[in-house]
């Protein structure tokens, strides 16, 4: 799985390595969240595979919605306002945070607005990947304009 891939990369290269999926699990665990809502850009089978991955880390998904983007190109072309509106819908469920996987979906500039509208932490693939990379490099977060995770809150 993901942990074996990261370990193989680390051993082969001799440098820290990570993955977006593991970054989601690490961020959720560090922040103490147990129940999350998910808005996945993927088709349903891929969205359900992400939920199964989270379950391996004892993370409960209280609500799952998907946008049926057939490819990364389609994710990248999605209207940001549509994504925000769907995140707001997911936030109406009993979750500690909202997750938006898929690094092809350009969400980093949307995170703060999503959190403002939902009143909840929103963890996106790009944000957790950047958060993990900063930590692996020995840095710390505290960046404004990119949501609570990268803001260090």
Descriptions of predicted regions:
Residues 1-153:
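Non-catalytic structural scaffold of enzyme domains
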